[in-house]
Design a protein with these regions (language model features):
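Eukaryotic scaffold repeat domains enriched in small/polar residues
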Residues: 7-8, 22-430
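Bacterial N-terminal signal peptides
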Residues: 12-24
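N-terminal Sec-pathway targeting helices
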Residues: 2-13
Length: 430
């Protein structure tokens, strides 16, 4: 080997070592599926990063109604947008004029329909509405997260059900049993948070949630259990069996590798991309983990690890066929990521300039996210003192794309112990 070749080889080795130290093991050695997709993706959002501006006129709530706290918002394949709210969270004097918990609007904000709120044969309507999804066939899926006395304004039996309805609100099916607790059951949930229905394989993915630390999968037609898994594909542990942090404000990315081996509480959202990658929003650990739909861990990204506000609350994809951008909900801002590389490209200011931040009940925004067919972004939550009214969700109109400037911070270099995931296969139905 010549002297020049020796020098080049040494420089390459030093460069590889530096990259490994900067990104941590999971990022330095991405699995082949993610690595291949990354090579195809525009680097740093080549062509620009989406820019948004809040639309104060969306939605147009009928004047006779008051809207409870907005829990979820989602776009459907017809171009309309749905809001799930919590009527029981309204002050008592407003509950007689509460808007229905499920409402559909067009992109201009015009009201189309509303329904829900009452229990019926075979199901209990949630005490505390949480997750919402409209699948490609038009079925509407909701769930609640009341657990005993926690998040239970109506003091009803625990929610712990996924409910499937027709587009106009006729009950179809329930997954789980109301009045039960989930533990690690294959058919009962515990504080589930959101739903995604993958019509390509007829599966329902549930982020479960506040009581359990897992993704759990059911058949979309029968509700039969298929499989489940936890962080890195590990067997999930219940809340009371998870390692505890030493203190409430302990930095969860420093010397807590044992904690990181499980999803934090709550595991708050789940989405599956067009190229069949599953994204899990681990709010408890401020990260997004990526899996195959059968539970094989691929990679992860931490968002806002040094911020005190809640992060990794919700997920949404840009509507282009390649779903180039991944939006990750946070408070008070949402994050814009290159979906295939997980590089952080920028943020969306979800609280208007000069609006209140940190005041109770005024800026609990970004609870869950949605997008419509034109690429506009929506957040569920509340900005009541900004607009002087409650409306459940807010529209951020896509105004164009800006030149790409590297933003924010690189992924944290988590400890070698946490990086050594020891990923396992998902637990499947026998």
């Amino acid at each position: 080997m010549t002297g020049n070749r020796l020098i080049n080889f040494a420089l390459a080795a030093v460069t590889l070592a530096a990259v490994t130290l900067l990104w941590g093991i999971p990022h330095a050695f991405k699995p082949a599926a993610v690595q291949a997709a990354s090579l195809e993706a525009p680097h740093w959002g080549e062509g620009g990063v989406p820019q948004f501006q809040i639309d104060p006129d969306w939605p147009k709530i009928p004047s006779k109604w008051k809207v409870g706290f907005g829990s979820a918002v989602v776009g459907d394949n017809k171009g309309n947008v749905w809001i799930l709210s919590r009527p029981r969270r309204l002050p008592k004097e407003d509950q007689a004029s509460a808007a229905p918990p499920v409402m559909e609007f067009d992109q201009a904000g015009n009201f189309i329909q509303g329904w829900g709120g009452q229990s019926g044969a075979g199901y209990q309507w949630p005490s505390n509405e949480h997750g919402l999804f409209v699948d490609d066939d038009g079925f509407v899926w909701i769930e609640g997260n009341a657990d005993g006395k926690s998040n239970n304004p109506a003091d009803l039996p625990n929610d712990n059900q996924i409910l499937k309805f027709t587009n106009d609100g006729k009950f179809v099916m329930a997954i789980g049993q109301s009045g039960q607790t989930g533990s690690n059951s294959t058919h009962i949930l515990k504080g589930a948070t959101d739903i995604f229905v993958n019509t390509k394989n007829n599966e329902v993915y549930v982020s479960d949630g506040y009581g359990n630390s897992r993704i759990i999968v059911f058949n979309a037609n029968t509700g039969a259990f298929i499989r489940m898994w936890g962080a890195y594909g590990h067997t999930p542990l219940d809340t009371d069996r998870r390692p505890a942090r030493a203190a409430l404000k302990q930095d969860p990315w420093t010397a807590v590798s044992e904690v990181l081996q499980q999803f934090g509480s709550p595991m708050h959202d789940v989405k599956v991309s067009n190229d069949q990658l599953l994204y899990a929003a681990d709010r408890g650990n401020k990260r997004v983990q990526v899996f195959t739909p059968d539970g094989k861990f691929l990679t992860e990204q931490f968002v806002g690890p040094d911020l005190e506000d809640l992060q990794a609350r919700g997920l949404a994809f840009s509507p282009d066929p390649g779903q180039r951008f991944l939006y990750v909900g946070g408070t008070p801002d949402a994050w814009i990521l290159n979906r295939r590389t997980l590089e952080i490209l920028g943020t969306v200011k979800t609280v208007p300039k000069g609006g209140p931040v940190g005041q109770t009940g005024t800026s609990n925004i970004g609870h869950l996210l949605g997008v419509d067919t034109n690429g506009n972004l929506y957040t569920a939550g509340e900005l009541s003192t900004v607009f002087g009214k409650t409306q459940g969700a807010y529209k951020y109109k896509l105004t164009g794309y800006s030149p790409t400037i590297p933003c924010c911070q690189a992924p944290r270099n988590i400890s070698a112990a946490a990086a050594s995931t020891g990923a396992t296969e998902a637990t499947e139905a026998p």
